[in-house]
Amino acid sequence: AVVFDPPPALWAEADXQQEPLRNLTQTVGQYLPTLSGXLAE
């Protein structure tokens, strides 16, 4: 499975404009492996 995990430097650069987007991406990133695991089983 491909996990979207940008380097911290990219997040630091985008903090000012994209904090909500980062939070959403982190939340999705936490749940995607769980969903994929359940579907794989």
Swiss-Prot record:
Glycosylation sites: 23
GO cellular component, as recorded: extracellular region
UniProt keyword annotations, A-Z: Glycoprotein, Immunoglobulin domain, Secreted
Location relative to the cell: Secreted
PTM comment: Glycosylated.
Tissues expressing this chain: Plasma.
Highest taxon of source: Eukaryota
Subunit field text: Interacts with CRISP3.
The name this protein goes by in its record: Alpha-1B-glycoprotein
Gene for this chain: A1BG
